[in-house]
Design a protein with these regions (language model features):
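Internal acidic/polar
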Residues: 69, 76-100, 120, 155
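DNA-recognition helix of helix-turn-helix
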Residues: 64, 68, 128-152
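Conserved RNAP core-binding helix
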Residues: 18, 28-45
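A short, charge-rich alpha-helical start-of-domain segment used by transcription regulators
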Residues: 1-19
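Sigma70-family region 2
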Residues: 37-54, 73-75
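C-terminal edge and immediately downstream basic/flexible tail or linker adjoining helix-turn-helix-like DNA-binding
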Residues: 4-6, 78-81, 126, 143-156
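Arg/Lys-rich amphipathic alpha helix in sigma70-family domain 2
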Residues: 48-50, 61-80
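A short pre-motif secondary-structure segment
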Residues: 110-114
């Protein structure tokens, strides 16, 4: 893969990457920064990618790691509260979003990747580097906790 092909592949997944980062970080600016950092890291090491078929999985894994790094930075430096800049940020106050934030990290990861980013169960397992059965179990546990938290029916 050369740089032109790398750029073309990035353009095909950029929106999905942003959506994933936004769901992890809950902030437009942080999400854009995380995507940029992930793309930069991928650009620096794209020649190490052995299977081009796994490009999307590979870049998404880099992005998730970058989101984790940003979350750690926010905890360490005590992120600041911002007023919503756009109507889309009002989504942060929705009960589902709040319930998802309360989930343990390993359950939240599965829910974000499965239901908000659209990955299959096997792709989710691959991205999280866990067996598919473990991903399915975490999905069931997360849905059960969300159902309890929201007090309503959550479909599988």
């Amino acid at each position: 893969m050369n740089q032109e092909e790398f750029a073309r592949r990035i353009e095909t997944v950029r929106k999905k990457l942003y959506k994933t980062a936004f769901l992890y970080l809950g902030n437009e600016t942080l999400a854009l920064d995380a995507v940029d950092e992930a793309v930069y890291k991928a650009l620096c090491s794209y020649k190490k990618l052995r299977e081009l078929d796994y490009f999307e999985t590979w870049i998404t894994r880099i992005l998730i790691n970058e989101c984790y790094n940003e979350q750690r930075r926010q905890k360490r430096f005590g992120g600041f509260e911002e007023l919503p800049e756009t109507a889309a940020e009002e989504f942060d106050s929705l009960p589902l979003k709040e319930a998802i934030k309360k989930l343990p990290k390993e359950l939240k990861d599965v829910i974000i990747l499965r239901y908000f980013t659209g990955y299959t169960l096997s792709e989710t397992a691959e991205l999280l580097k866990i067996p598919q059965g473990t991903a399915a179990t975490r999905q069931r546990k997360a849905l059960k906790l969300l159902k309890l938290e929201l007090g309503e029916e959550v479909s599988e």
